[in-house]
Amino acid sequence: MEKNGNNRKLRVCVATCNRADYSKLAPIMFGIKTEPAFFELDVVVLGSHLIDDYGNTYRMIEQDDFDINTRLHTIVRGEDEAAMVESVGLALVKLPDVLNRLKPDIMIVHGDRFDALALATSAALMNIRILHIEGGEVSGTIDDSIRHAITKLAHYHVCCTRSAEQHLISMCEDHDRILLAGCPSYDKLLSAKNKDYMSIIRMWLGDDVKCKDYIVALQHPVTTDIKHSIKMFELTLDALISFNKRTLVLFPNIDAGSKEMVRVMRKKGIEHHPNFRAVKHVPFDQFIQLVAHAGCMIGNSSCGVREVGAFGTPVINLGTRQIGRETGENVLHVRDADTQDKILQALHLQFGKQYPCSKIYGDGNAVPRILKFLKSIDLQEPLQKKFCFPPVKENISQDIDHILETLSALAVDLGGTNLRVAIVSMKGEIVKKYTQFNPKTYEERISLILQMCVEAAAEAVKLNCRILGVGISTGGRVNPQEGIVLHSTKLIQEWNSVDLRTPLSDTLHLPVWVDNDGNCAAMAERKFGQGKGQENFVTLITGTGIGGGIIHQHELIHGSSFCAAELGHLVVSLDGPDCSCGSHGCIEAYASGMALQREAKKLHDEDLLLVEGMSVPKDEPVGALHLIQAAKLGNVKAQNILRTAGTALGLGVVNILHTMDPSLVILSGVLASHYIHIVKDVIRQQASSSVQDVDVVVSDLVDPALLGAASMVLDYTTRRIH
C-alpha cells in the first residue's frame, strides 16, 4: 500500500453529470478499476445522463461495465435560469442521503457545471475530501465562476496546463495539493487508432460521405447572454446550409436556452434536411473518430478548443463561450459571429485543412499521474483546507513558536565532486553544513543523501531550527514539477530519470523541491544576493562546469522542456574543444574548471606550468587553481589560457545580452573574479551599444547552490498559510 494514512483501500466516489464530463472521468474510473488492491470505486450518476431527450447516456456507463451505485434524478426541466438553480437545489436535497450511505474517503468532481457545484458543496459540508478535475482554466461565461467556486471547495486539484496550475496558485491554493497531470481524455485521444473509422463515419453521416468531407457542429447556449447565443446559432445553421456539406449536428447541453436552440433547429428543418444528421449523443470512442477525420468542427464547445487539437482538425470557435481557453493553431476564433457571411467565410478558410497535432492539454499520461496522486493522499492529515496568501503586513501580536524557533530549510547541493547538505535560515544564514564526496553510483548517492538529511534534520531540532522543507540543487536537466532529474551531465554518473522527491519526502515527511544548479544560483541571487529586487537578470555560475539561470519579470525561466539557461552550452566557436555535453566549442569547454584543469595538465606534462615561486606535490592532481596561480606569477601561457577562457565566457554573455537584454549579469562561482574584467572588455568590444550599459558583477554569495536550494523552500513558506 502507498501512503494514504491507514492500511485500507481508498474509497473513491466518482460522480458524473453529463456526456462531456464522463469522457474526462471514464479514463480515471478505468484506472481505478484496474487497481482493486488500492481503491474501492462507487459511481453516482445524475443530471442529464438520466434524461431521454439527452440520450439516456447513463447506458454508456453501464456498457463500459461500471456498476452504477446510485442514480439521482436532479434536473428540473424548463431549460431556463430558474430551472438551473432549482436543479442545484434538488441535488443538494438528495445528495446527503447518498453520501451518508456511501461514506467515501474522497469524491472526484469534474469541471464547471452547475451539477458539479452541487456535488462539491454537498461533499465539502459533509467533510468529504474533494478532488477537482480541470480546475484553474478560464473560458468566458458563468462556467468560470462555477469552476472557481468548486476550486475553493476542493481539497485537491488536477489541472491540465501550466497556465491553469498558475491560476490555481494565484487563487491561493496549496501548491502541494495541485497536480499538473494533463487532461485524462488525452490518454484516450492520443492512443485512439481505429482502422475501421470509415464505418463509423458512414453510420452517423451516410454511406456516400468521404473522409475530411463533412462537418461536426456542436453549439451550446451562453447562459449570460441567451438571446445573442440563440441568434448566433441561427446564423450558424444558415451558414452551414449555404456551405452545402454533410454536417453532424449534436443537440446542445441542458443549460438555460437549450430549448430555444432546439426550436431553431426544428424551425429550419435540420432533423429532416438531407445534408444534416441531428443526434442527441455519440459515444465518445466514436465521437473522437468523427472529429479526427472531419473537414472541420464548428461551434462553441470546449471539446473544439481542447480535445480536437490532438488531431489537428480545423476548428471554428464561435462567440465568447471559450474566449479564455488556451488553443492551438487549428482554432479560428469568430468572436463576433454576428452575420451569416462572417461564419461562411470562416468555413471557407478552415474546411479541409490539416494542422499539426497539438498537445497543449495533455501528453497521454494523465491517468497514471492521477492514480499516483490519489495513493499519496494522507487521510490522517487535517481535513480543513489551508490557503496560501501572498505576503501581507504581519499582525503586531507575537507567536511563541516564532520567538523560540528559527524557520529554516534543508538545502542539498549535488555537485560534480561534492555532496553538501546545510541547514539554512530564513535570512540566508547557513547554520550548519555537512560535506561528503559525491559517490559514483546511484544507490550509494541516494543512501548518502538520505543519511545526511536525516542527520541534519536531527541536528536542526537541537539547534532549535524548524525545518519547513527540503530544496535540492543538482547538475543536469530537471523537471521541477515532478522532482525528477531527467538527464545529468557526465560529471554525475547514473543520474538520469531519477525521482529525488519521493524518497526524501517519504523519509523526512517534508515537502521537497528540486531544480538545476544554475537555476538555484539565480534563485539565490533573487532572494539573498545582488539580484534582489531586480526584474530581469542572468546568473552565470562558474565551477567544475558552467551553469546559469534566467530571471525574467521576477520569475525563473525553465523553458518548455526544462532546458532553458543551459548557458554553459552556448557555442562560441565552430571548431572549439570537445564539451562534456557531446558538442564542441561550448563556453564550458573553454571556461569551466574542467577545461582549465585540462589545459593545466597539458602545460604540466610539457613542463610549462611551474614558474618560480610555485610547486605541485607529486600526490596532488594538477587543477585549475594551479593554472591561476601560475598566471598570477607571470606564466604567459597560463595567462593566455585564462584570457581565452574569459573571452569565451564574455562572448557567451554578449549573446545573452542580445537575446534577453537583462539589466544585470551576475558571475558566480570560484572562477568569477578571475573572469570579470575580461568579460567586461569583451562586452565593450563586441556588444551593440544599446546593451553596453548592463551591470556585470561578481556574486557576493559564498554558497549560491545551497542558498538557491533553500530559497525554493523559504520563498514558498513566506506566503502566509491559513
UniProtKB/Swiss-Prot annotation:
Pfam families: Epimerase_2, ROK. The active site is at D517. Zn(2+) binds at H569, C579, C581, C586. CMP-N-acetyl-beta-neuraminate binds at K259, E271, K280, H281. The UDP-N-acetylglucosamine 2-epimerase activity, in contrast to the N-acetylmannosamine kinase activity, exhibits allosteric regulation by cytidine monophosphate-N-acetylneuraminic acid (CMP-Neu5Ac), the end product of neuraminic acid biosynthesis. Moreover, the activity is contingent upon the oligomeric state of the enzyme. The monomeric form is inactive, while the dimeric form selectively catalyzes the phosphorylation of N-acetylmannosamine. The hexameric form, on the other hand, demonstrates full proficiency in both enzyme activities. UDP binds at R19, S23, R113, H220, N253, V282, S301, S302, E307, R321. This is Bifunctional UDP-N-acetylglucosamine 2-epimerase/N-acetylmannosamine kinase. It comes from Cricetulus griseus (Chinese hamster). The gene is GNE.
